[in-house]
């Protein structure tokens, strides 16, 4: 059965409403704007316009990335009122491919732990067992995916922050080669920075299948002028 972007988004929003109170994975919602974007996506689909590979796909983003118009904290109480005016570069690539960002998912303070607690939003629980952790630092991302609250997620990883939550929640996560996906707009460093600040961290997708990982990587991977030593072959 063919479904509209609006119907797909509404189904995920209903799932968030149903299961998120006990899991606490999705910590910020932008439902109204997302619904408007879904309606626009449906109109574009009906007009037979050229569509991106993620056209009309609703998704959430780890709260370590800046997302335009949605509170973006990095799990840091000092940044709890930060509402970016731009997207992180990796987020923008998803948006340019047609994705509709409808929320943010929980992280530990500055993405610096293998669990997902911070003083702003509290603790994220593993949807398979609410007494256990989904891991970290992309624990909110993995928990939201495993609980059917989102079909795709963008995470980040230094020492297991994508891989551990994917393992704990029975998902697929990929830590790509260093700097083939831009981390400009990742927190840390502080909001609004034009550099990544951390030479070890990489951005990467989490999904429920390897095929979905491949689709996401095709969108996310790109050389950036300021932030792509991996692409500069001499």
Residue locations for each model-derived region?
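Glycine-rich beta-alpha junction loops
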Residues: 63-65, 160, 212, 220
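Residues forming well-ordered secondary-structure scaffolds
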Residues: 85-89, 139, 169, 208-211, ...
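Gly/Ser-rich catalytic/binding loops embedded in alpha/beta enzyme cores
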Residues: 2-158
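Structural signature of FAD isoalloxazine-binding scaffolds in flavoprotein oxidoreductases
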Residues: 163-168
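A short helix-breaking turn/cap at a secondary-structure junction
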Residues: 175-234
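Ligand-binding "clamshell"
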Residues: 169-175
């Amino acid at each position: 059965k063919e479904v509209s972007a609006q119907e797909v988004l509404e189904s995920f929003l209903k799932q968030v409403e149903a299961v998120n109170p006990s899991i606490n994975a999705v910590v910020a919602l932008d439902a109204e704007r997302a619904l408007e974007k879904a309606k626009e996506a449906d109109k574009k689909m009906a007009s037979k316009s050229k569509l991106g590979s993620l056209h009309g796909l609703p998704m959430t983003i780890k709260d370590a990335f800046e997302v335009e118009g949605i509170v973006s904290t990095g799990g840091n109480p000092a940044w709890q009122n930060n509402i970016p005016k731009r997207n992180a570069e990796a987020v923008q690539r998803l948006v340019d491919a047609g994705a509709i960002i409808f929320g943010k998912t929980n992280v530990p303070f500055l993405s610096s732990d293998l669990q997902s607690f911070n003083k702003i939003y509290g603790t994220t629980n593993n949807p398979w067992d609410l007494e256990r952790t989904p891991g970290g630092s992309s624990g909110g991302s993995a928990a939201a995916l495993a609980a059917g609250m989102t079909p795709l997620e963008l995470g980040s990883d230094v020492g297991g922050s994508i891989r551990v939550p994917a393992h704990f929640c029975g998902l697929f996560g990929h830590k790509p080669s260093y700097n083939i996906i831009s981390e400009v707009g990742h927190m840390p460093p502080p909001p609004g920075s034009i550099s990544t600040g951390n030479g070890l961290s990489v951005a990467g997708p989490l999904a429920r299948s390897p095929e979905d990982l491949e689709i996401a990587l095709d969108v996310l991977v790109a050389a950036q002028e300021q932030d792509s030593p991996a692409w500069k072959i001499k």
